């Protein structure tokens, strides 16, 4: 160890001359109550007042969260800083204190809101306020606690981490108990309860891990090291481990009533000696070895103290302890002699078991420096007197060995209640006294006789008392006897004491219990254990077998004991005691030797207590049984939805493994069977959304902005999210076809599912006609109305469930009409989250329903026949127009005279083919899709061939001035007809482009333009030298006709009318067109849309803005002119300019002539 002269850094603040001032590196830090005082008070509070309600909330405020300021929080940090000699950096320190201050302020608001609500629990405003305050408090703690575990400072921050963790668990318990009365839905409450049980383990494991890390860090070889080691162990047991050991009691479903816990761990005051410093090299291991190894708890009855003398000084040389087992259930036993049996004075017997035991010692120390000659050349460090004070409500006199002293044990282990005298408010009582000694002969350098006082928490009662109105936890270290093969081992740090261990079958232990309730009172037993093997527990009372049950392994062999290694299990069969004083026996059987079984405690629970776990089991059993049509689980009830099965599965998953593991497994298998039956009757492919657009002809198809998300509090499995769209002609969509082969003739089918929230969600079922609903489901925080109880934890209001029926007439596999299932959103504010979709057989059609579907089917067939007749005519005309564009049936070359207007005219005739796509969603092919796509593909080829002949890039200026060289000022403007045109407003401006050509080939330069005002507009083509030609444009009013101008102003308009020319956007196609239906109220009343099949074609309003409708005619006044040009080199230049006024150019084309 480093012998730093600045030794005050290792001195605990509560051992200084002024307990109100702490010293750290020369700083003076003013404090109020010490962290140990506060922690002892908190532990007492948790042991005695662990009942949820305003009393508990306000108690936490009074003890810590309402009285602490920055200096008090800083004291918690200083405490561990001094022990481990590590200073927290200023930033981390200030951040931690600021967070603690914020939590304190927020919790005071929470506590006041809780108090007001408890006084008026039905007040809606106060209920809402509690929901707000809980959410704020939970969010703040969730954010803050990781900051108390910041890297490199986990140990110095450990005590404040535990304080914040304790607060968080208390708040989560509040919502688990009172959340429904505050207005939270069952799903939220269950989720927060799951957080509670998970965080109990997480917070516990963090605290124990870093406690052990800090303890290892302060260990050293010398006595001074041991002093610091023991101080760390003692103080962090009080400020960390004791509090952590009570965390499991926050589980409100396992401990729904008052629960009494006991702390049986022991802590040790430092050896009461002067000059007990680092001069005793190598003595740390010896001092630690003088402490008792793990053992059963016993009751200290008396101490017989022996006295010896040295150089005329009398001192405590040795002693013998007499003790009794817990409950005084056996004969008194005597421990071996500690120290030596001195005879310099008569032995003195201190009776320790008076009142509530010895709570305080006041010791006198004796230190004599060595002389230089003979026997006197020795150092003497001993105890020459001690006063033993009894804890009692009366003035019971103390017992004194020789004399009282000034070394007060309360300086190291303060009372837990400073509002009463220490004899009443003490926190610990003396449990044992051992001795560290050194120097056994006259040749020894020093003589040390150091009594080692062990202390146990006062909650560890002398008897094992079982009342009728509370859950009683009894650590098994309070057993009377251990079974052969059972041992006591050191506890893992979070059990509040040591634990028992067995590695072979047999009796674990027996303990004496005293029943204060009437013997008619019935109880259930629970066991907290950890095991590497499956095993069977047996219990008996006074030799009478009571319970026997099989329980599973909780950990793997060789793993460390952690919070999650332990499980609390119970027997369902209640029992009663026959005698007021009985012997309870616990045994473990049916496992192979060599495995490890650890037992922490047993619990006696009044049988009248209705546990949440029992209620959950009954509710889950009822919910599972109601899924099926009969008790043998052959079939599902028709009205049982897939979503409902998932919620029942959630209910089963939430059952306690500790309380009903076997029943949980059985119910889980039944629910899985129900899920399989649900999947079998569901005609949808991939109902769980494993993917969209994975296969061309199977499963779900959808737009690219749909997302698949995993399960959450609402959905157990995958669900989809549909977002709004900025263009109603490009909706968000999801669809699937039910194959004809899956359908039965004259049967009604139902589409149903669950919507978490939606706006403007349109749902379609399409066969002979379109069934359509628009569904708006508000996404409120509560999915279950407050006025109605939720039958299942995560089930929601029925309005979140939707269903839509469709009737099927006769079926025809060749026709393969099937049923289209479509979900669509076409508004900007629209959205939806939905899942658990089903399409299933509902019932055969009879009576009026049968007649109605036959009538609808006949109308549909009549309409289909008429459509086929019309289609034959339209197809013939369209095909002729398309064929006329090409030179042959291979469709690989255009006719020499084919121009853009002819292609547009043919395209328009192709688009006159009806029912190419469903008007409800134009990405779904209709009955004429094949012939339409055949002709549309040739139109696309025609456009491609035509584009290949035009060697000018961006000749229509749709990409602005890209590819053009510009001099002066020009603009590209979008006209009212949505066409982009080049505007040359000044005579000095010029636009040009260099074009590569094939020398010796012929080209046609074609320009469509309009001239405003006087002057001429010119489009010139030329090479480097000569070979120049141009097209000139003037205002049509002048009626000038130029050479080579083959079309006049009026001619162009006439050409447009002749071909009805419109332009198709080849990039967009028709994959977004659909019917625009007005929204209907979400009353779920289905209606046939028969007139869509009787009144003619279902119009698609987006069609005028899509496909060929994108090409709009030019206004009157535009002129198209062309000339022939034969380049002599491989480059030509196209130049655009004007002499006066404004020149407007729609397009420039340079077309390669056919050979």
Curated annotation (Swiss-Prot):
Asked if the Swiss-Prot or TrEMBL record annotates the protein with the keyword Coiled coil, the reply is no
UniProt-listed InterPro entries:
Cry1Ac-like_dom-VII (IPR048645), Cry_V (IPR041587), Galactose-bd-like_sf (IPR008979), Pest_crys (IPR038979), Pest_crys_Cry1Aa_dom-IV (IPR054544), Pest_crys_dom-III (IPR005638), Pest_crys_dom_I (IPR005639), Pest_crys_N_sf (IPR036716)
Q: Which GO terms describe its biological process?
A: sporulation resulting in formation of a cellular spore; symbiont-mediated killing of host cell
Matching Pfam families, A to Z? Cry1Ac_D5 (PF17997), Cry1Ac_dom-VII (PF21463), Endotoxin_C (PF03944), Endotoxin_C2 (PF18449), Endotoxin_M (PF00555), Endotoxin_N (PF03945)
What is the superkingdom listed in this entry's lineage?
Bacteria
Q: Extract the Gene3D superfamilies matched here.
A: Galactose-binding domain-like, Pesticidal crystal protein, central domain, Pesticidal crystal protein, N-terminal domain
User: Family per UniProt?
Assistant: Belongs to the delta endotoxin family.
PANTHER family noted in UniProt: ENDOTOXIN_N DOMAIN-CONTAINING PROTEIN-RELATED (PTHR37003), PESTICIDAL CRYSTAL PROTEIN N-TERMINAL DOMAIN-CONTAINING PROTEIN (PTHR37003:SF2)
Q: What else is known?
A: Toxic segment of the protein is located in the N-terminus.
Record's protein name: Pesticidal crystal protein Cry1Ab
Which species?
Answer: Bacillus thuringiensis subsp. aizawai
The gene from which this protein is expressed is cry1Ab
């Amino acid at each position: 160890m480093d012998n730093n002269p600045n030794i005050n850094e290792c001195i605990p603040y509560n051992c200084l001359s002024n307990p109100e001032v702490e010293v750290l590196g020369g700083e003076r830090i003013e404090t109020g109550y010490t962290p140990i005082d506060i922690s002892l008070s908190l532990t007492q509070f948790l042991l005695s007042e662990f009942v949820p309600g305003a009393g508990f909330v306000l108690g936490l405020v009074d003890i810590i969260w309402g009285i602490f300021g920055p200096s008090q929080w800083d004291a918690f940090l200083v405490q561990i800083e001094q022990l481990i000699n590590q200073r927290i950096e200023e930033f981390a320190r200030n951040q931690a204190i600021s967070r603690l201050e914020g939590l304190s302020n927020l919790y005071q608001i929470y506590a006041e809101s809780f108090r007001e609500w408890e006084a008026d629990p039905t007040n809606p405003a106060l209920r809402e306020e509690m929901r707000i305050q809980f959410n704020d408090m939970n969010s703040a703690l969730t954010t803050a606690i990781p900051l108390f575990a910041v890297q490199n400072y986990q140990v110095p921050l450990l005590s404040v981490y535990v304080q914040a963790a304790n607060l968080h668990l208390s708040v989560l318990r509040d919502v688990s108990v009172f959340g429904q009365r505050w207005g939270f839905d069952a799903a939220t409450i269950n989720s927060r309860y799951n957080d509670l049980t998970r965080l109990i383990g997480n917070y516990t494991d963090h605290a124990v891990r870093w406690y052990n890390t800090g303890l290892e860090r302060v260990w050293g070889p010398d006595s001074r090291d041991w002093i610091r080691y023991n101080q760390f162990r003692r103080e962090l047991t009080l400020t960390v481990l004791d509090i952590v050991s009570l965390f499991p009691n926050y589980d409100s479903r396992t401990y729904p009533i008052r629960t009494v816990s006991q702390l049986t761990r022991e802590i040790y005051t430092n050896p009461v000696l002067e000059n007990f410093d680092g001069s005793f090299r190598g003595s740390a291991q010896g001092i630690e070895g003088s402490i008792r190894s793990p053992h059963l708890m016993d009751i200290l009855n008396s101490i017989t103290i022996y006295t010896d003398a040295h150089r005329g000084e009398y001192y405590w040389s040795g002693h013998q302890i007499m003790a009794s087992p817990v409950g005084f259930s056996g004969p008194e036993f005597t421990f071996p002699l500690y120290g030596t049996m001195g005879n310099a004075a008569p032995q003195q017997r201190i009776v320790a078991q008076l009142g509530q035991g010895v709570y305080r010692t006041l010791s006198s120390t004796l230190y004599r420096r060595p002389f230089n000659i003979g026997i006197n050349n020795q150092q003497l460090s001993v105890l020459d007197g001690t006063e033993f004070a009894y804890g009692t409500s009366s003035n019971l006199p103390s017992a004194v060995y020789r004399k009282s002293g000034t070394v007060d044990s309360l300086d190291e282990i303060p009372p837990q209640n400073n509002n009463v005298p220490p004899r009443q408010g003490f926190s610990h009582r003396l449990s044992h006294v051992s001795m560290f000694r050194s120097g056994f002969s006259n040749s020894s350098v020093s003589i040390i006789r150091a009594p080692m006082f062990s202390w146990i928490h006062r909650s560890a009662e002398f008897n094992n008392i079982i009342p009728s109105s509370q859950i009683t936890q009894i650590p098994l270290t309070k057993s009377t006897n251990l079974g052969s093969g059972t041992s006591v081992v050191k506890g893992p740090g979070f059990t509040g004491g040591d634990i028992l261990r067995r590695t072979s079958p047999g009796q674990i232990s027996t303990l004496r219990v005293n029943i204060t309730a009437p013997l008619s009172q019935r109880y259930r037993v629970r066991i907290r254990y950890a095991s590497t093997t499956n095993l069977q527990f047996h219990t008996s009372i006074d030799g009478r077998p009571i319970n026997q049950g099989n329980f599973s392994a909780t950990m793997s062999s060789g793993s460390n004991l952690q919070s999650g290694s332990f499980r609390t299990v119970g027997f369902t069969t209640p029992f009663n005691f026959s005698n007021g004083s009985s012997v309870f026996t616990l045994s473990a059987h049916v496992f192979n030797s060599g495995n490890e079984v650890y037992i922490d405690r047993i619990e006696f629970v009044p049988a009248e207590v209705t546990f949440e776990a029992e209620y959950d089991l009954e509710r889950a059993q009822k919910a599972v049984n109601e899924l099926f049509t009969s008790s043998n689980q052959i079939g599902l009830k028709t009205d049982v939805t897939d979503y409902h099965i998932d919620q029942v599965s959630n209910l089963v998953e939430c059952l306690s493994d500790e309380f009903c593991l076997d029943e949980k497994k059985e119910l889980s298998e039944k629910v899985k069977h129900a899920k399989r039956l649900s999947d079998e009757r569901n005609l949808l492919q991939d109902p769980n959304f494993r993917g969209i657009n994975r296969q061309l002809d199977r499963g779900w198809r959808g737009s690219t902005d749909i997302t698949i998300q995993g399960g959450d509090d609402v959905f157990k499995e995958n669900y989809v999210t549909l977002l709004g769209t900025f263009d109603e002609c490009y909706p968000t969509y999801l669809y699937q076809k039910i194959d004809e082969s899956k359908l039965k003739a004259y049967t009604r089918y139902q589409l149903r599912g669950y919507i978490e929230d939606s706006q403007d969600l349109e749902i379609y079922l399409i066969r002979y006609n379109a069934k359509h609903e628009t569904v708006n489901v508000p996404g409120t925080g509560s999915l279950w109305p407050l006025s109605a109880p939720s039958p299942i934890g995560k089930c929601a209001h029925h309005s979140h469930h939707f269903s839509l029926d469709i009737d099927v007439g006769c079926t025809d596999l060749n026709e393969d009409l099937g049923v289209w299932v479509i979900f669509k959103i076409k508004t900007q504010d629209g959205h939806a989250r939905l899942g658990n979709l089903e399409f299933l057989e509902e019932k055969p059609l009879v009576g009026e329903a049968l007649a109605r579907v036959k009538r609808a089917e006949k109308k549909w067939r009549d309409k289909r026949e008429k459509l086929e007749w019309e289609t034959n005519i339209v197809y013939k005309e369209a095909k002729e127009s398309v064929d006329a564009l090409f030179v042959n049936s291979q469709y690989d070359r255009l006719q020499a005279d084919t121009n853009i207007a002819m292609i547009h005219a043919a395209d328009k005739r192709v688009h006159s083919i009806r029912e190419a796509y469903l008007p409800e969603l134009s990405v779904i092919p209709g009955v004429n899709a094949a012939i339409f796509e055949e002709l549309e593909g040739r139109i696309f080829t025609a456009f491609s061939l035509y584009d290949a002949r035009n060697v000018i890039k961006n000749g229509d200026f749709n990409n602005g001035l890209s590819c053009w060289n510009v001099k002066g000022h020009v603009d590209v403007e979008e006209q009212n007809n949505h066409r982009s045109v080049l505007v040359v407003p000044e005579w000095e401006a010029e636009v040009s482009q260099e074009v590569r050509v094939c020398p010796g080939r012929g080209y046609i330069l074609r320009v469509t333009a309009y001239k405003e005002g006087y002057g001429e507009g010119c489009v010139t083509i030329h090479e480097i030298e000569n070979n120049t030609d141009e097209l000139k444009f003037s205002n049509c009013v002048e009626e000038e006709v130029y050479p080579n101008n083959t079309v006049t102003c009026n001619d162009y308009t006439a050409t447009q009318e002749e071909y009805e020319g419109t332009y198709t956007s080849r990039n967009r196609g028709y994959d977004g067109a659909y019917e625009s239906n007005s929204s209907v109220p979400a009353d779920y009343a289905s209606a046939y849309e028969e007139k869509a099949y009787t009144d003619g074609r279902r119009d698609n309003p987006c069609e005028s803005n899509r496909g060929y409708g994108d090409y709009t005619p030019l206004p009157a006044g535009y002129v198209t002119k062309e000339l022939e040009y034969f380049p002599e080199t491989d480059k030509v230049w196209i130049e655009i300019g004007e002499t006066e006024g404004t020149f407007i150019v729609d397009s420039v084309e340079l077309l390669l002539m056919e050979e």
